[in-house]
Swiss-Prot record:
It comes from Chromohalobacter salexigens (strain ATCC BAA-138 / DSM 3043 / CIP 106854 / NCIMB 13768 / 1H11). It comes from the Bacteria. PROSITE patterns: EFP. HAMAP family: EF_P. Involved in peptide bond synthesis. Alleviates ribosome stalling that occurs when 3 or more consecutive Pro residues or the sequence PPG is present in a protein, possibly by augmenting the peptidyl transferase activity of the ribosome. Modification of Lys-34 is required for alleviation. GO terms for cellular component: cytoplasm. Belongs to the elongation factor P family. Disulfide bonds: none annotated. This is Elongation factor P. It is found in: Cytoplasm. InterPro entries: Elong-fact-P_C, NA-bd_OB-fold, Rib_uL2_dom2, Transl_elong_fac_P/YeiP, Transl_elong_KOW-like, Transl_elong_P/YeiP_cen, Transl_elong_P/YeiP_CS, Transl_elongation_fac_P. One of its GO terms (molecular function) is translation elongation factor activity. Gene3D superfamilies: 2.30.30.30, Nucleic acid-binding proteins (2.40.50.140). Keywords: Cytoplasm, Elongation factor, Hydroxylation, Protein biosynthesis.
Length: 188
């Protein structure tokens, strides 16, 4: 496997650290007035999700992590596992557990493509597309003249997620939602 020197560190790079695959979130090169230069790196463990900071002396290197990020279509859930299928024509299916799903579970919609991270042929993380279109299944009716400023109300979506929406949104409407922030963007 390839090794990466500290001068090759950048956000999004996948490396092995203490036997676990990690993703570099931030890398700051520091050259103090006295002493050796070093890199202050913020990493996320891809298995546990833990984020921490480490410093590496200039010239140190880390082994690259053998992880695959594949686009997979969400098929169904059988209670404790979520099933995804590769979209590259192989139709290979992967079962993903609750830990790997994280908070993506509330943005799941059948036949939508998600990014699944595999390590040693096991799914360790799932990430949703930036925007997803979901139907409103429950919300209070918005009354005209209800407020002086533009107000908002909670709405439950078909996936179970609850987002704040403008008063003019009604049940049955399809909304575009930002999965990174959990905020309403527009009507679909």
């Amino acid at each position: 496997m390839a090794t990466y020197s500290t001068n090759e560190f950048k956000g999004g790079l996948k490396v092995m650290l203490d036997g676990d695959p990690c993703s570099i979130l931030e890398n700051e090169f520091v050259k103090p007035g006295k002493g050796q230069a070093f890199s202050r790196v913020k990493l996320r463990n891809l298995i546990t999700g833990r984020v921490w900071e480490r410093t590496f002396k200039s010239g140190e290197s880390l082994e690259g992590a053998d992880v695959l990020e594949l686009d997979m279509e969400y098929l169904y859930s059988d209670g404790d596992m979520w099933h995804f299928m590769r979209t590259d024509g192989s139709f290979e299916q992967y079962a993903v557990d609750k830990k790997a799903m994280g908070d993506v579970e509330k943005w799941l919609k059948e036949q939508v493509v998600y990014t699944v991270t595999l390590w040693n042929d096991n799914a360790i993380a799932v990430s949703a597309p930036n925007f997803i279109e979901l139907e409103v299944v429950e919300t209070d009716p918005g009354l005209k003249g209800d407020t002086a400023q533009g107000g908002s109300k909670p709405a439950t979506l078909s996936s179970g997620a609850v987002v704040r929406v403008p008063l003019f949104i009604n049940e049955g409407e399809v909304l575009k939602v930002d999965t990174r922030t959990g905020e309403y963007v527009s009507r679909a």
